[in-house]
C-alpha cells in the first residue's frame, strides 16, 4: 500500500515529463545508438512478428541481435527464411564467458539485423553472447514474445538524455490478451473476457507499474 501511494507522485512526475516529448523529438540526431538483444529459445510461434516489429521501431540508429539459444524447434530456420539470413565470419572479443557459438548470420533485407546461433545455456548466457557481439555502448534486452510500442525505444532512452549518470532504465509490462495487434504492434488496448486473466492484469499493474514507480 505504501509503495502504491508513493508511486502516485512518480506517475505525476512522469506525466509532466511526457510534455517534453515534442521537444526531445527535435534532438533525434543526439539519440545514443542502441543494440537490442533478443534471446530466443523455442520461439517459433512468435519470433517472426516480434523481430519484424523491432525492426520498425521509431529510432535513429539501432541494431537487432537475435540470440538463438539452442532452440529445438524451427526458430532459427524461420529467421533464415523470413529475413534472408546468410552465414558470416565474425571475429569478436569474448568479454563474457558463454556456451559455444555455432555461427553468425546477417540479413540481406535488413542491414541492422544479425542472428547468433549458440548452444543452449539459458537466458543469461544468451544475453552475454549478445553483449559480446554488440556494436554500441548501450543495449536493451527484449523477450522474444514481447510487443513494443513504436516509440518505446525513444522513451526508455529518455533518462539517458536527461541525466548522464543514468546506467539503467526499464519499461512497464502489460498483458496483451484482449487487445488488437497487427504486424507486431499494439493498435488498440483492451480487456480479456477471462476473469483469471483480468486478475493477472491487476497483479501486473501492481508489480510492474506501481511497484517500480514506488521504488524509483
Residue map of PLM features:
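N-terminal membrane-anchoring/stem segments of glycan-assembly enzymes
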Residues: 1-30, 212
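Cell-envelope/extracellular polymer assembly enzymes that use nucleotide-activated donors
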Residues: 32-35, 63
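A conserved acidic beta->alpha catalytic loop
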Residues: 68-88
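Short, acidic, metal-binding catalytic loop of nucleotide-sugar glycosyltransferases
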Residues: 52-61, 82-89
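Long helical/loop segments within the catalytic core of UDP-sugar-dependent glycosyltransferases
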Residues: 6, 88-128, 132, 150-151, ...
Amino acid at each position: 500500500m505504501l509503495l502504491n501511494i508513493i508511486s502516485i507522485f512518480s506517475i505525476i512526475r512522469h506525466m509532466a515529463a511526457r510534455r517534453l516529448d515534442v521537444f526531445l523529438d527535435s534532438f533525434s540526431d543526439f539519440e545514443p545508438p542502441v543494440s537490442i538483444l533478443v534471446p530466443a529459445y523455442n520461439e517459433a510461434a512468435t519470433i517472426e512478428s516480434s523481430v519484424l516489429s523491432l525492426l520498425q521501431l521509431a529510432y535513429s540508429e539501432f541494431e537487432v541481435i537475435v540470440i538463438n539459444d539452442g532452440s529445438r524447434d524451427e526458430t532459427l530456420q524461420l529467421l533464415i527464411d523470413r529475413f534472408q539470413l546468410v552465414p558470416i565470419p565474425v571475429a569478436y572479443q569474448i568479454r563474457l564467458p558463454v556456451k559455444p557459438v555455432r555461427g553468425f548470420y546477417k540479413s540481406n533485407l535488413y542491414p541492422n539485423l544479425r542472428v547468433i546461433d549458440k548452444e543452449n545455456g539459458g537466458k543469461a548466457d544468451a544475453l552475454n553472447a549478445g553483449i559480446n557481439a554488440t556494436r554500441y555502448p548501450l543495449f536493451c534486452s527484449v523477450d522474444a514474445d514481447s510487443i513494443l510500442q513504436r516509440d518505446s525505444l525513444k522513451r526508455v532512452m529518455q533518462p539517458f538524455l536527461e541525466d548522464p549518470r543514468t546506467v539503467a532504465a526499464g519499461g512497464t509490462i502489460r498483458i496483451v490478451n484482449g487487445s488488437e495487434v497487427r504486424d507486431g504492434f499494439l493498435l488498440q488496448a483492451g480487456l480479456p473476457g477471462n476473469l483469471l486473466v483480468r486478475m493477472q492484469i491487476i497483479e501486473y499493474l501492481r508489480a510492474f507499474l506501481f511497484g517500480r514507480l514506488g521504488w524509483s
